[in-house]
């Protein structure tokens, strides 16, 4: 009885494996029907679609930031520099979008994904906050030349930050700001 079941199960499994390949062979060999065109790999198309969505999202965030009240509240010259940096970042994103649209392999999309991953929109938000702190301390630091030097260095370093700047670059700006605050704390104490 068990032998019969095993033989039957083997026959069914073999038929299940052979039937689809036999149908596929007859489908290709059918005369009169044109062969189906080859489609690009679905993974590349899906990766490209997701990359384009991610790029559009980052571009939208940059657009909102450039017209935000936080940026508009900065001093005019500082605001112009921050908006210029954001505009440059948006141009870089447009170049990346063109690269992604032209990508035809997984290697290309991986390289674009890596470049997009290193693109940090939040750097600009951090820059705005740091510059606002610098502007808030400038009046109190007017009498202390050492603090003024640190604040000027912090503002200059902050305005050099781009979307691809590292966290170490941001840390340098914060260190200048902390040094200025420490200098102000030492003079008032």
Predicted regions and their residues:
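Mature extracytoplasmic/periplasmic regions of secreted or cell-envelope proteins
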Residues: 24-189
């Amino acid at each position: 009885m068990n032998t019969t079941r095993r033989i039957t199960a083997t026959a069914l499994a073999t038929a299940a494996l052979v039937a689809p390949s036999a149908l596929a062979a007859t489908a290709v060999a059918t005369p009169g029907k044109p062969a189906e065109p080859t489609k690009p790999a679905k993974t590349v198309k899906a990766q490209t679609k997701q990359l384009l969505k991610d790029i559009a999202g980052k571009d939208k965030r940059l657009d909102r930031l450039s017209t935000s009240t936080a940026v508009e509240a900065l001093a005019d010259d500082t605001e112009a520099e921050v908006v210029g940096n954001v505009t440059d970042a948006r141009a870089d994103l447009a170049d990346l979008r063109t690269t992604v649209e032209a990508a035809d392999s997984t290697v290309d999309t991986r390289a674009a994904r890596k470049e997009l991953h290193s693109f940090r929109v939040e750097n600009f938000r951090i820059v705005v906050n740091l510059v606002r702190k610098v502007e808030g301390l400038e009046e109190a630091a007017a009498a202390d030349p050492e603090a003024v030097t640190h604040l000027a260095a912090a503002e200059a370093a902050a305005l050099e930050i781009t979307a691809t700047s590292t966290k170490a670059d941001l840390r340098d700006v914060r260190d200048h700001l902390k040094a200025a605050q420490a200098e102000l704390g030492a003079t008032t104490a």
